[in-house]
Amino acid sequence: MKPKVFITREIPEVGIKMLEDEFEVEVWGDEKEIPREILLKKVKEVDALVTMLSERIDKEVFENAPKLRIVANYAVGYDNIDIEEATKRGIYVTNTPDVLTDATADLAFALLLATARHVVKGDRFVRSGEWKKRGVAWHPKWFLGYDVYGKTIGIIGLGRIGQAIAKRAKGFNMRILYYSRTRKEEVERELNAEFKPLEDLLRESDFVVLAVPLTRETYHLINEERLKLMKKTAILINIARGKVVDTNALVKALKEGWIAGAGLDVFEEEPYYNEELFKLDNVVLTPHIGSASFGAREGMAELVAKNLIAFKRGEIPPTLVNREVIKIRKPGFE
């Protein structure tokens, strides 16, 4: 009898097909997030669970899932899962690193360029008919933005995604500063990057890009005090997690001109609505689409399947998050 896996959202077909050879697969087919009460019912009979970053997988879920042995998170981050509780119960947790690195780094640079050069504002100007209404083909003072080539970028968090952003910055001949919990001297040499204390990085950078995981230490890492350290011409880009930035402080900074602009792909609450923020024209907003390329999302689905199949065969999953769990329970559904 095949073990049962429940997938909380429809993922690319390539991953589902891989799983169907080894598992009894059920997929929540609604576009909307699965209601909590339904999730708690569905997990009662499953051996494996594939989750999205928008679902809270905590003690309550585990208590309702007596057969659950592995949670495969369809994301690189896993702050939506109570890792300590999972480990205590002998439940393996996996994620999907690497396969979405380039797509997320691309989006960081897309936001950086779009914000610096008023791409979205220009698009609205054309679509609204305002350009035609003005009756002027070109004006030397319209949509003046900030140069990117040769400027200074400060990357907070130099993991896989942070390094990929730095490689793109190198192509723009940018001075690369970074702040991380630990210095990475080999990466410094490879990318000609400079390690800086956080406050110095904020003072010196023309563009500040956040690429850190959400932890107790990084919650509201960018607050009012630190926003005031940035240049008035600086632009903040967040492709990390929304709660790394104090949104109220950021709105104040954008309204009062402490910084020039922001590009945000992540928010403190998602889906997100903030009337004050949405009124501002010096911010570019996207709905958490960092990994939203065909290649990245299919790669994530394949990695989810590979993790579950490896576990079923008694092997350690390739991207196991909580390695301590191996001491508590061997991989496999037996």
UniProtKB/Swiss-Prot annotation:
Keywords for the protein's UniProt record, in alphabetical order: Cytoplasm, NAD, Oxidoreductase
Q: Which residues bind NADP(+)?
A: 158-161, 180-182, 239-241, 288-290
Q: Which domain of life is it from?
A: Archaea
Q: Which Gene3D superfamilies match?
A: NAD(P)-binding Rossmann-like Domain (3.40.50.720)
Provide the protein's localization: Cytoplasm
**Iron as a keyword?**
no
EC no. given is 1.1.1.26
Q: Which Pfam families match?
A: 2-Hacid_dh (PF00389), 2-Hacid_dh_C (PF02826)
Cross-referenced CDD domains, in alphabetical order?
Answer: GDH
Per its record, the protein catalyses: glycolate + NAD(+) = glyoxylate + NADH + H(+)
Cytoplasm as a keyword of this entry, yes or no, is: yes
* Annotated InterPro entries: D-isomer_2-hydroxyacid_DH, D-isomer_2_OHA_DH_cat_dom, D-isomer_DH_CS, D-isomer_DH_CS1, D-isomer_DH_NAD-bd, Glyoxylate_reductase_GyaR, NAD(P)-bd_dom_sf
Provide the active-site residues from the annotation.
241, 270, 288 (proton donor)
Provide the family line. Belongs to the D-isomer specific 2-hydroxyacid dehydrogenase family. GyaR subfamily.
Q: How does it assemble?
A: Homodimer.
Q: What is this protein called?
A: Glyoxylate reductase
According to its UniProt entry, this protein's organism is Pyrococcus horikoshii (strain ATCC 700860 / DSM 12428 / JCM 9974 / NBRC 100139 / OT-3)
